[in-house]
Amino acid sequence: MNTTVSCELHLRLVVSSESSLPVPAGLRYDTADPYAVHATFHTGAEETVEWVFARDLLAEGLHRPTGTGDVRVWPSRSHGQGVVCIALSSPEGEALLEAPARALESFLKRTDAAVPPGTEHRHFDLDQELSHILAES
């Protein structure tokens, strides 16, 4: 049986060193896809942007800078609060988001309870994933 862990977060989109905008976001973790965290960023009334992150990347980013390429994550402070910075890069543009560190850590602890780190392979159905990929081609 698959378990889903989700949470809603209030992120900040960093526009400049003096300015940021609120970005409501949802994180979702499904034990059927144990390596990934799916993020939905609500960028407008009806608009959303979706990204998929490695759970390990977010967990490591709580404590130290990590990631290369399209996604980089690191701990920081903003207005006296612990935040996790998430830098996203794609052909469509770049964004720097700040997530509240405590809320992200709480979410990740709940994912760890669902699938302890290092045991993801026990929850990953390779045959199902290959069937899905082959069906798309």
Swiss-Prot record:
Keywords from the named record: Cell cycle, Cell division, Septation, Sporulation
KW Transport (keyword) present: no
Gene induction: Transcriptionally regulated by stress-response sigma factor SigH of RNA polymerase. Transcriptionally regulated by BldD.
Gene Ontology cellular component list: cell septum; divisome complex; spore wall
Domain of life: Bacteria
Disrupted-gene phenotype: Does not sporulate as evidenced by the white phenotype of the aerial mycelium compared to the wild-type gray. Produces long non-coiling aerial hyphae typical of developmental mutants arrested in a very early stage of aerial growth. No effect on vegetative growth or production of the pigmented antibiotics undecylprodigiosin and actinorhodin. Aerial hyphae occasionally undergo typical coiling indicating that mutation also affects later stages of the development. Aerial mycelium does not septate into spore compartments. Increased levels of actinorhodin production.
Record's subcellular location: Cell septum
Gene3D superfamilies: Sporulation-specific cell division protein SsgB
Signal peptide start and end residues: none
Pfam families: SsgA
Disulphide linkage map: none
Subunit structure: Interacts with SsgA. Interacts with FtsZ (via N-terminus).
Family of this protein: Belongs to the SsgA family.
Function: Involved in sporulation-specific cell division. Required for early stages of sporulation. Important in the process of growth cessation prior to sporulation-specific cell division. Recruits cell division protein FtsZ to the future septum sites and tethers the contractile ring structure (Z ring) to the cytoplasmic membrane during sporulation. Stimulates polymerization and filament length of FtsZ in vitro.
Name by which UniProt lists this protein: Sporulation-specific cell division protein SsgB
Gene from which this protein is expressed: ssgB
